[in-house]
Regions:
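Low-complexity, Ser/Thr/Pro/Gly-enriched N-terminal "stalk/linker" regions
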Residues: 1-9, 181, 228-230, 243-312, ...
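Extended ligand-binding clefts on enzyme/binding-domain cores
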Residues: 155-177, 345-368, 442-447, 469-575
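Short Pro-Gly-centered flexible turn/kink motifs
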Residues: 65, 114, 208-229
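An extended acidic
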Residues: 1-81, 154-183, 249-275
Length: 648
């Protein structure tokens, strides 16, 4: 499960699969409508030469991946030795408009001159629905257009000598006995069928004549719009500017955007710099321009599971934005705060997760528990961490205009909810834990809620709302006092997973959970050097260890999610390893921290990506790749490393 290349501009987002083919195509929201969201919806690339044909998806091709340094421009190199062909595809989503660009360098590796035909296949499921798509050839424009309703995709291209595609076809795909129009390409010729509707695909052909060891280029693009007119306008812009110019402009855009992170990267040890900058870019790639931050756009798992990660969890978003704020980026956080304010419930809390347009995402959390207890199906930590993040942003920028705008409309209702949604002793009432599994008052949620109320009190004071400041600070202190009496298990020498107060008793869940120790010190519920936190991490090292040969740590005991071996504690996650490194840094143990960071650094893919979790034996990536949170936690850990060096 992987997308070794992802490309984005905050409106269009494209995922390239392990065969070098387009396999996720989001527009007009990052993480929203995926017009290529199915196992068989990859956009194929094929080559015909010497009366032989091969698709890149076959095992005969050797495919490698990289990025152009300091950009979100991907490079796919595909070699077929038997055919004597190499394709070098430089891919980008145009930084300024909704267009996917491929600069395809076609190389003849043979000792003789040859005619080579390159076939580009389009296979959309527009707006996530197979019904009622249309593909047409537009003779006046010499393009193909796939469309349905307010979505149009114009297919254009040219060779390096300014010739466009010389054949095309439109056909049915996976319906009425038709496999797809891509089959029409396999004899090297296309039928020029000009229209089809229903479940459709299309192919265009570019013809090249290359001398021995010669090469040429094919420029290919998909321009998207909410109408034919808009998509054609972008198509004409590419023609007028030239596709190479659009690629160069996109490279310039990303290098300018990344310049804010460059001084920090330069201060890091050299072995971390590429991974640091790549992770910053990968976080940015998952941010929709209207504020949502998507957990992952890799939809490979949709073919095996019920859903994808293409949602905005406020928690994941906050962890993704935290290092960007520390680096001095502002636009992304401000857009996210606006997103949160728009989706905030009338009761002052955020829901489980959202689609990038602000609609409620799918959920498995009920309003009524099995014992009849009724409560909103939320994770309270997701509301709390937004307050915490906003306060962090305000502390850095002291933007009083921003505070005046967001205090009454977001901070005050959120903090009022956090302060009031407590039990008779002052602890947060039960909600779902950050892992989305258990309904209880978790240590992690208590910690971030305490921190949020403390920060909200400071924001209230800055705003001039003294009564709210006192009220929220009082609630925070009461919460901390109770927590420090009930959340540590002296028998297991660890902070507990959480508590659930039933009518007759308080039930304590003593499961060892990495988030309990991390949250307790990171958000100030306990001092980092306290006995409770130190012993908790020692217990975590012992209980959640997944191997004697690497430092991988599971999230919690008996974590069944994607676990292959039921005798193991669970799969290790990258964020838990990085949390451990951050605590070492907090304790002044830089050598132990860098050993963990070095190990994570070595597990990155060739394109700098980290998955959600990995196999404890083979170290192969499991679940989505990349996971935005994993990339962000890597950046945060390196920022902590620099901070720790400044303290010493």
């Amino acid at each position: 499960m992987a997308r070794p290349i992802i490309l984005s501009n905050g409106e269009m987002h494209v995922g390239i699969n392990r065969s070098g083919l387009v396999h996720d195509f989001y527009y007009p929201y990052v993480g929203g409508e995926n017009h290529a969201e199915a196992h068989n919806l990859q956009h194929r690339v094929g080559v015909w030469v010497d009366d032989r044909f091969s698709w890149l998806s076959s095992d005969d091709w050797e495919v490698t991946f990289s990025y152009v340094p300091e950009t979100l421009i991907g490079v796919v190199t595909a070699v077929q030795h038997d055919l004597g062909i190499m394709l070098e595809m430089t891919d980008a989503v145009d930084a300024e408009q909704a267009a996917f660009l491929r600069n395809i360098h076609v190389v003849n590796l043979a000792e003789n001159a040859r005619d080579i035909r390159l076939f580009m296949h389009q296979n959309f499921i527009i707006s996530n629905s197979y019904a009622s798509d249309t593909v047409q050839y537009l003779p006046d424009e010499h393009v193909l257009v796939h469309y349905k309703g307010p979505r149009s995709f114009v297919i254009g291209g040219s060779t390096s000598d300014a010739k466009t595609f010389d054949q095309y076809t439109a056909g049915l795909n996976g319906i009425e006995g038709f496999e797809g129009s891509y089959r029409d390409a396999e004899d090297g010729e296309l039928s020029n069928h000009a229209v089809e509707h229903g479940r459709v695909d299309s192919v265009v052909r570019f013809s090249l004549s290359l001398a021995a060891h010669d090469s040429s280029r094919v420029y290919y693009w998909i321009a998207a719009g909410k109408s034919h007119r808009e998509a054609l306008r972008i198509h004409h812009k590419i023609l007028d500017d030239g596709p190479l110019h659009r690629l160069l402009a996109t490279a310039t855009h990303w290098r300018q955007w990344l310049s804010r992170a460059q001084p920090t990267a330069a201060a890091l040890p050299e072995r971390y710099r590429d991974g640091f900058l790549r992770s910053v870019l990968l976080v940015k790639a998952h941010i929709d321009k209207r504020g949502a931050v998507i957990a992952s756009t890799d939809t490979t798992m949709l073919n095996y599971s019920r859903d994808t990660y293409a949602y905005c969890w406020p928690r994941d978003a906050a962890f993704a934005l935290w290092p960007l704020i520390r680096l001095g980026y502002t636009d992304e956080a401000l857009s996210f705060f606006g997103f949160c304010r728009r989706v905030l419930s009338g009761h002052g809390y955020l829901m489980h997760k959202y689609t990038p347009d602000g609609a409620l995402g799918s959920s498995w959390h009920p309003y009524r528990q099995r014992d009849g207890y009724e409560a909103p199906p939320i994770q309270e930590d997701e509301t709390a961490i937004v307050v915490f993040l906003f306060a962090h942003y305000y502390t850095l920028h002291r933007d009083d205009k921003l505070l005046r705008e967001f205090y009454p409309t977001m901070i005050e209702p959120m903090a009022n909810f956090l302060a009031s949604y407590v039990d008779e002793e002052g602890l947060p009432r039960p909600t779902y834990d950050l892992w989305e599994r258990l309904f209880l008052t978790s240590t992690y949620t208590t910690a971030i809620t305490y921190a949020a109320l403390t920060e909200a009190a400071r924001l209230a004071e800055a705003y001039g709302d003294q009564a709210a400041s006192v009220r929220w600070q009082t609630a925070a202190e009461a919460m901390q006092g109770v927590a420090q009496h009930v959340l540590f298990d002296t028998e297991r020498q660890a902070l507990v997973k959480g508590v659930r107060r039933d009518p007759d008793a308080t039930v304590v869940d003593t499961t060892i959970d990495a988030s309990s120790a991390y949250g307790a010190y990171m958000f100030g519920l306990y001092a980092a050097d306290s006995h409770e936190v130190a012993q908790s991490f020692a217990t975590i090292d012992r209980v959640l260890k997944t191997s004697d040969y690497h430092p991988g740590l599971a999230r919690f005991e008996n974590d069944e999610y994607n676990r292959f071996d039921p005798t193991r504690v669970g799969n290790p996650w990258y964020i838990t390893v990085l949390w451990r490194a951050q605590y070492h840094l907090e304790c002044g143990q830089a050598d132990r921290a860098t050993a963990l960071i070095d190990w994570v650094n070595g597990q990155m893919t060739t394109t700098g990506m980290l998955a959600e979790q990995f196999d404890p034996d083979t170290l192969q990536s499991i679940s989505v790749l990349p996971l935005t949170w994993s990339q962000a936690e890597y950046v945060s850990c390196l920022l902590d490393l620099l901070h720790s060096e400044k303290r010493t």
